[in-house]
Amino acid sequence: MRTLRIMTLLIIGFGCMQAQTRALHARSFELTQTAAGSPLQAGNSITDVVVSNDTIWLGTGKGLSRSINGGRSWKNYYDTPEFGKEDISAVAFRGKDVWVATAHTVDKDGQSLPEGSGLRYSSDAGETWKVISQPVDVNNVDTLFWNSKSTIRALGITTAINNITYDIAIAGNAVYICSFAGMARVSTDTGKTWQRVIIPPDNLTSIGPNDSLVFDLSPSGGALNLQNNLNHRAFSVYAENDSTIWIGSAAGLNKTMNRGRSWLHFSKQTQTNPISGNFVVAIGQQRTNTKNIIWAATINATDNTEKRGVSFSEDGGISWKQTLLGEFAHNFGFKNDVVYVPTDNGVFRSGDLGQSWVQTGTIFDKTTRQRYTQSKFFGAASNGDTVWLGGGDGLVKTIDNISTPFGSSWSILHASRPLPSATETYSYPNPFAPDDEVVRLHYATGKPSPASVTIRIFDFGMNLVRTLIQNASRLPGTEHDEIWDGKDDSGNQIVNGVYFYQIVVENDEPRWGKILAIQ
């Protein structure tokens, strides 16, 4: 499949585990509209959804998108001088300050590896941008000051490969980033300089400003024989306020309440009521009328007692409750007492602190007759009663209130190129991988009234493979998508190759298009 999915290989002890963090998708064949005022977002692979009032920011496989009118129109930044064709790996904004991390893959020694390509910063809500290189170090080993009794040896990260920023948090004049091999870093001068954040090693539950410390700040020992600390492999960060910062790693959660002068370290092994697993890929905060709750996506790491799931704390991390055990959660969205959790198996909703959950089933847009074809979701956010969800098959909107319960009505937004004329057609994505995605056939009837449409798929030898629809009525004045899942009329998955599709509207001449299937 022609997609970039960051599969981070965590070398842990004598074994390894492969963990999918926030997925990045870069389909060069994915369709987009980059002009300002586009009715649709830039891409259909959405990894980040961030909302404040009517402003919505999306991180997609086709760059960054912004709406300032509740999703009615979008400004897309893909292929602009500042963003180029980079993937978006993280988005954060506060007021008019916006921070965006970008990434791509590089081929090295026969492997396709993730590489951080820097950050973009805007102080005027996305009107202008400053390009910042991915933070790297000059030396292989540095010495960092902690106090008069302690200096910390720190591994120097001299490459952007595997140094990819997965999360960003803004706290006052400070911006925090978590970049896996690049560790956690902070800048207080809008990205001109970056300092490594010193957090506890694996074997300590806290560090303070007066402690005598002996450890290495290093996510990997390597040839330099430094201490290997999974807690320094940083994946997620959240600013509860300007002083209280949470950092999630491959060894649990870290919390400071004084801007990094001291840290607490929470893990599965060190608390009576702990998190479910130590690999923390997302952190969020829910503020209700009576509670302040920290939520974390806590995935199993090295200990076989750990479980993937969601953990939440109502007392600042002293104790945790576990829920959605068995689910791989990617992020959180909130609406007062309600929490939304995008996972590999759809989006889960709870209004009672995880005691009960409602899971999205089939997502079908009754207006466009479109079905959401992917189960994985990576982003969730709300604007009043409107809930926005992002995943591998576009952007989804639903209403969640008493009169319109969550999931009772869906709107699916797919980025697509407008047809040059009503008699033309195209398919997307093309090529497509039938083992894990669908292809959409895009067309319009070109008729002034409802028309009968038949669509057939043929192989390279012009043998009939599938009749998608036959004499189906389609409305005028709009463009349609019909989904092909890469199966024939008997339900068998097709083989790689070139396929042709035929669209017949009423008794008009057939319209033809070509699809390349690669898996």
Segments (PLM) and residue ranges:
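Beta-strand-rich domains and repeat architectures in extracellular enzymes and scaffolds
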Residues: 34-65
